[in-house]
Regions:
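Proteins synthesized as precursors that undergo proteolytic processing into mature forms
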Residues: 120-158, 162, 251-259, 267
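C-terminus-biased signal that marks the final domain/tail of proteins
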Residues: 27-41, 49, 55, 62, ...
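N-terminal export leaders
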Residues: 3-16
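Sec/Tat signal peptide C-region and signal peptidase I cleavage site
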Residues: 21-27
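A contiguous strand-loop segment
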Residues: 27-123, 156, 325, 335-340
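Short acidic-glycine loop/turn motifs at beta-strand connectors
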Residues: 34-37, 100-102, 172-175, 181-186, ...
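Catalytic cofactor-binding cores of redox enzymes
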Residues: 151-187
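Structural recognition of the beta-strand scaffold that forms the well-ordered cores
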Residues: 41-43, 105-108, 169-171, 179, ...
Length: 354
């Protein structure tokens, strides 16, 4: 992501949206702009009621990866990364968003209605919290990633001493897109135009059916303005559908950032649609990933100055994961070299204490 595109968008303004307090709704949004004519661009907001301590991570090739976090399993999946990747490390333990050197993008969002299969230890087990890490480490395209997920058993792992429902979105430079959800113990995949937008519960099929009630999609209702997942899904879908063709890759990034601002949750905002008046899940950060040109940018809600990395400038050969904390970074612009020289992570945060 380059400075011109970010300034054009007035500057870039969810680890897992973790529902630690019963009754509090969650929020995260992902949008893929793949028809703008200039670049394949993915935007994502992370909304959480606690600080996820977002850091940029650089995962080199041949890095050891493990399939489970808080569970003990005799057949947990293990691997060494085939591709280098960069993304957001949340709570010191989970890659919640990122892009690899081949341009595959992955976003991990909360979905409370997820239902995973009963564990079958004859099949290698993969934590749902490791989904983004696994696909970015090992696959170059959306279809490769889906095929890889079909060979393992994804299970609900424990983070912060409890189980979380999660779903995964995927995109690659060809324009391919997919959403992976776990419904009644089975993995379900939605591809194509129906997978360009993802928020939270209810699941994607419900969201697509609900969207038809609104004027941009043949219904009678005006666009909803609340912060609940269905309202954000409809707004994001509508604004994505009306984006003009981009004049440049910079314009494609800036235009998508405008969509993301319309689904971001301001500090103190409350959800008046679901009755969750306690809802204060503000947007912590927003990412814009240009899959065509290999740029990955992030802006913290607490810092008006965005930073980004350029994939071709990152060092993909190394001995461990490098971690660059973002809060108080005191920099703006391209931080590729800063990330290349960032400290190695020597210990993963305990999943019960992050």
């Amino acid at each position: 992501m380059r400075r011109r595109s970010l300034s054009t968008a007035a500057g870039l303004s969810l680890l897992l949206a973790l529902p630690l307090v019963p009754g509090i709704a969650n929020a995260c949004s992902r949008v893929f702009s793949n028809a703008n004519g200039k670049a394949m661009v993915v935007g994502r907001t992370m909304d959480l009621f606690i600080d996820d301590r977002a850091a940029l991570a650089l995962r080199p090739r041949a890095l050891a990866g493990g399939g489970l976090l808080g569970l003990k399993d005799a057949n947990a999946l293990h691997w060494r990364s085939r591709y280098g990747s960069t993304g957001v490390l949340s709570l010191g333990a989970v890659i919640s968003d990122g892009i690899n050197e081949r341009g595959l993008n992955a976003n991990l969002l909360y979905l409370g209605t997820s239902r995973y299969p009963d564990r079958n230890t004859a099949i290698p087990g993969l934590s749902n919290a490791k989904l983004a890490e696994y696909v970015l480490d090992n696959f170059a395209t959306v279809e490769e990633a889906i095929a890889g997920l079909e060979r393992v058993q994804v299970v609900s792992d424990r983070v912060l001493n409890r189980d979380w429902g999660l779903h995964l979105s995927l995109a690659d430079p060809s324009g391919a897109s997919a959403v992976v959800e776990f419904v009644d113990g089975s993995m379900k995949v939605k591809r194509g135009n129906d997978s360009l937008v993802m928020t939270n519960e209810p699941g994607l099929n419900w969201q697509l059916n609900n969207r038809r009630r609104y004027k941009p999609f043949g219904g009678t209702l005006p666009l909803p303005g609340d912060i609940d997942p269905p309202s954000r899904f409809v707004r994001a879908s509508a604004y994505l559908s009306t984006l003009p063709k981009a004049a440049s890759a910079d314009d494609a990034e800036a235009n998508l950032y405008g969509v993301m601002k319309n689904v971001a949750v301001p500090a103190g905002a409350r959800d008046y649609s679901t009755g969750d008046s306690e809802d204060t899940w503000m947007t912590l950060w927003t990412t814009i990933a240009n899959l065509s040109q290999g740029h990955y940018g992030i802006q913290l809600n607490s810092d008006p100055d965005p930073v980004w990395v350029t994939l071709k400038h990152l060092h993909w050969n190394g001995s461990g994961m490098r971690v660059l904390p973002l809060r108080g970074i005191g920099r703006t612009g391209d931080v590729s070299e800063l990330l290349n020289g960032a400290p190695l992570q020597t210990k993963t945060a305990p999943t019960g204490a992050v």
